[in-house]
Amino acid sequence: MEKIRIKLQAYDHRVLDKAVSIITDAIKRTGAEVKGPIPLPTKIRRYTVLRSPHINKDSREQFEIRIHRRIVDVVNASPETVDQLMKLELAPEVDVEVRALS
């Protein structure tokens, strides 16, 4: 295996940064090279709802949710690196996607 791309996303950037540091430490222990973490643009989803269930169209409330994303590239990955990545315990709030690149 030559290169692995790890995409992470979470609603809380502190939890995401902690997960990235855990991953990079595990990769560095195996001797592989780490590129990143590369911060990607934060997606902001906004929702506007009426406060009243019946009337008062002018009275509205707005909510937003922010999705923070990071990319970590692993160069010169060995089977030991993959084993270490599979054994990691990350926070359940963090969505992790792992892809093998050529």
Swiss-Prot record:
Gene3D superfamilies: Ribosomal protein S10 domain (3.30.70.600)
UniProt xrefs under InterPro entries: Ribosomal_uS10, Ribosomal_uS10_dom, Ribosomal_uS10_dom_sf
GO MF entries: structural constituent of ribosome; tRNA binding
A biological process from GO: translation
Stretches assigned to coiled coil: none
Pfam families with a match to the protein in the record: Ribosomal_S10
Record GO cellular component, one term: ribonucleoprotein complex
Keywords recorded for this protein, A-Z: Ribonucleoprotein, Ribosomal protein
Family: Belongs to the universal ribosomal protein uS10 family.
Subunit structure: Part of the 30S ribosomal subunit.
Stated role: Involved in the binding of tRNA to the ribosomes.
PANTHER family: 30S RIBOSOMAL PROTEIN S10 FAMILY MEMBER
HAMAP family: Ribosomal_uS10
Protein name: Small ribosomal subunit protein uS10
Taxonomic source organism: Nautilia profundicola (strain ATCC BAA-1463 / DSM 18972 / AmH)
Gene designation per UniProt: rpsJ
